[in-house]
Amino acid sequence: MKKEKMIAFSFSLFLGIITWFTLATSVRKGLPLLDASIFEYFGYAMSHGQRMYLDLFDHKGPVIFLINYLGYSIGASLGIKILYLVSLIVFFYIGYYISRLFTGIRNSFVVLVITFIIFESFFEGGWGLEGYILPCLTYSLYIFLKYFLEDKINKYEIILSGFSFAVVLFTKANMIGIWLIFSLLVTIKLIYQKQFSIFLKYIALFITGSALFIVPLCCFLWFQGSLKEMFYQSVVMNFIYSKGSGYLTVMEMIKWYMNQVNVLQLNLMIVIAMIAVWKQYGIKILFYNGAFIFCLMLALISKRAYLHYLIVLIPLFIPYISVAINKFMNKSSLLCFLIFTIGLVFIYWGPIHGIKD
């Protein structure tokens, strides 16, 4: 077990380092028109005494202000980049364990490589807020999946899931789809089984985890005098932005999304996964599909065709990819493994070449 954890971490570190070299070298020079340049300025301004929501305006939640402030305090733009790298390493590491719920060790490393390719295809030079919260999304998805597949969950896992929920909520509220849909499923399951005491216990633990982040944050904002402005800018203004008229219609957004994921063969993998596990999981796969569609709707709600908006869906792709890979690579023969791996290189030749460039 320890050896597997060490190998998984080392491979996650390797993928993180590769991502480091594909990041824009400078937010201000490399990404002048994206939000990342604004985020870096937040870090600079706050390190020079300016206050979020009072001296600085944005419709994002306070987490992105604090992350860039912390990163800038560590080492200016390099410090921000280091925090982004750490977030990605944790994301890949947890993603490995999501894959392990559905397939073996060897296949899970293949899944991580595909996950890396998908991330590189979506991240638009990096530094965006979606990358920082990937560990929270991925960890909570892992906990929910483990609970439904193995009926196992610990107190600290629920508390950490609640904490992760609060972090994402105060980053960008339309990214909390995983908690909304899976919490509903947990509620239905426990009420149907008449496990009311366990249900109340889970609620208390989840609220405790959320409060561990929300209470100190709100106290800080209150003492700073920006609590009211935070709610106005990050909730009211963000709702106006999300519901504002994007330049694409709903059908155009769906078409755009389908084009992006079809290039990466993701829809094909979803279909293969659904067929492969129907006998094993039955209606559970339909519930998972519903959760995925709900999160997709939230990601595209602004009707703006930004690839980095799709980053929050990557953790949800991992189970599909894992099942699909397991379907085709379940032979113990090393030759079969090598042949299929070479085949994947040809399938992803375009995205791989794009990463190289």
Task: Describe each model-derived feature in a short phrase.
Residues 62, 66, 74-90:
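Loop-to-helix entry region of an early transmembrane alpha helix in multi-pass inner-membrane enzymes
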Residues 92-118, 134, 152-156:
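Transmembrane-helix signature of polytopic, membrane-embedded enzymes
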Residues 103, 140-160, 192-193, 272-284, ...:
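Membrane-interface transmembrane helices that cradle and orient dolichyl/undecaprenyl
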Residues 123-133, 306-307:
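Short acidic/glycine- and proline-prone juxtamembrane loop motifs at membrane-interface regions
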Residues 156-173, 179-184, 212, 292-301:
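Membrane-interface alpha helices of multi-pass inner-membrane proteins
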Residues 133-151, 157-160, 164-165, 183-186, ...:
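Specific aromatic-rich, kink-prone transmembrane helix
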Residues 177, 296-298, 302-333:
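Hydrophobic/aromatic-rich transmembrane helices and adjacent perimembrane loops
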Residues 2, 13, 93-96, 261-296, ...:
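Hydrophobic, aromatic-rich transmembrane alpha-helices
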